[in-house]
């Protein structure tokens, strides 16, 4: 492991904290901010229905965290390392008669996201949204670091694309989804808030491999399987209180200078170690160097402090979680996204689960998902 203990330098003059209300302006579901860059292939007549299941993901680290620190009109080239998780969104899309419009099953728990995904996908295909959509999701906490919002949007969009024969290639679909991402506003029902989206949630279902490196513009540059002997153990603080997106975004905006400072200080080191150590080893089936880089990023480069807005006491909790790394109980140990969930990729799930439970965390066991999204039923 390469130890990184140099204190972070001052970031220079402190920039005025932006007014969150002046950034990330809300928008209506179905708004297309960035059209599909490449025209779709032939759009065949839709099947009568299709069912797919789409994995979720854990976000181990960003490659350039400073790139998320601003309202960049939904284009974020921060890059990330993600682990695909066998906790799924189950999507059922049915064709309706021409002119019948879009309807969502009453059981859809996050209707604005499902509606947005269906509408922007139909816009990309150049078809009318005459569809009925149902979604059931495996249980996961919302706004805890699982990418539940972005993976749900990706799941519905991929299912609609699948219904029409997949005319939009995955390499084009991924940046289209990141460039049009939004999440429920919170204080303004029916609207979405732009949220930084780097592409890992969509990539986890569009590309095979349990671990993926996503670079700029939603470009997957590495996708490899997770060895079968490793599993995921996730710890979520029991004291977690769900907060609305607009409140979380306001808290994150106040920390933007910290993200920029981390990026300016550490992104060259991250890039070098990723390119010359972590990726070559991962291609040979060794995730050790990647795990060392992830640990240093989270626990030594200031990432967890940057994300401390997501949960009271997060930094102190990280100090307690860190023991799993020093005990060599985890191949990868990280906060997921901005948290507050932590996870371990491990060959000793019992030890990791015990530690999370000792720290008053709910424990979730999951398997890495080494495939793509899967069709589970269709009819023509």
Each language-model region and where it sits:
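Residue-level signal for inorganic ion chemistry
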Residues: 60, 91, 290, 337
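Short Gly/Pro-enriched turn/cap motifs at secondary-structure boundaries
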Residues: 80-84, 193-195, 333
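ATP-dependent small-molecule kinase catalytic core of the GHMP/sugar-kinase superfamily
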Residues: 3-48, 61, 67-78, 169, ...
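Intrinsically disordered, low-complexity, positively charged segments
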Residues: 49-85, 90, 97
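Active-site nucleophile and cofactor-binding loops and adjacent substrate-binding regions
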Residues: 146-148, 195, 204, 335
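N-terminal pre-core extensions flanking Radical SAM catalytic domains
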Residues: 335-346
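Anion-binding (especially nucleotide phosphate/pyrophosphate-binding) glycine-rich loop
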Residues: 48-49, 86-191
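Short beta-strand
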Residues: 332-336, 365
């Amino acid at each position: 492991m390469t130890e990184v203990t140099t204190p972070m330098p001052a970031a220079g003059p402190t920039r005025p904290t932006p007014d969150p209300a002046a950034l990330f302006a809300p928008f209506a579901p179905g708004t297309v901010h960035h059209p599909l860059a490449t025209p779709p292939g032939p759009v065949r007549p839709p099947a009568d229905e299709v069912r797919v299941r789409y994995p979720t993901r854990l976000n181990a680290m960003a490659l350039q965290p400073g790139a998320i620190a601003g309202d960049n009109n939904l284009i974020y080239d921060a890059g990330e390392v993600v682990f695909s998780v066998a906790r799924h969104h189950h999507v059922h899309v049915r064709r309706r008669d021409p002119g019948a419009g879009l309807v969502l099953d009453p059981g859809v728990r996050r209707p604005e996201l499902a509606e947005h995904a269906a509408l922007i996908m139909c816009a990309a295909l150049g078809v009318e949204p005459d569809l009925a959509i149902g979604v059931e999701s495996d249980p996961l906490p919302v706004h805890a670091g699982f990418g539940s919002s972005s993976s749900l949007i990706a799941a519905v969009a991929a299912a609609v694309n699948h219904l029409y024969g997949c005319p939009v290639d995955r390499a084009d679909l991924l940046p289209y989804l990141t460039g049009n991402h939004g999440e429920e506003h919170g204080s303004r029902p029916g609207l979405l808030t732009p949220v930084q989206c780097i592409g890992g949630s969509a990539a986890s279902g569009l590309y095979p491999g349990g671990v993926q490196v996503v670079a700029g513009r939603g470009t997957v540059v590495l996708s490899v399987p997770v060895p079968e002997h490793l599993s995921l153990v996730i710890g979520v603080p029991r004291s977690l209180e769900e907060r609305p997106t607009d409140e979380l975004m306001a808290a994150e905006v106040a920390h933007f200078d910290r993200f920029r400072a981390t990026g300016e200080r550490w992104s060259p080191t991250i890039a070098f170690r990723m390119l010359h150590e972590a990726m070559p080893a991962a291609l040979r089936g060794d995730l050790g160097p990647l795990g060392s880089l992830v640990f240093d990023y989270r626990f030594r480069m200031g990432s967890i402090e940057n994300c401390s807005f997501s949960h009271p006491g997060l930094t102190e909790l990280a100090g307690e979680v860190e023991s799993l790394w020093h005990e060599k109980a985890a191949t990868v140990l990280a906060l997921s996204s901005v948290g507050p969930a932590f996870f371990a990729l491990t060959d000793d799930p019992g030890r990791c689960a015990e530690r999370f439970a000792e720290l008053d965390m709910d424990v979730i066991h999951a398997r890495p998902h080494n495939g793509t999204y899967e069709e589970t039923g269709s009819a023509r």
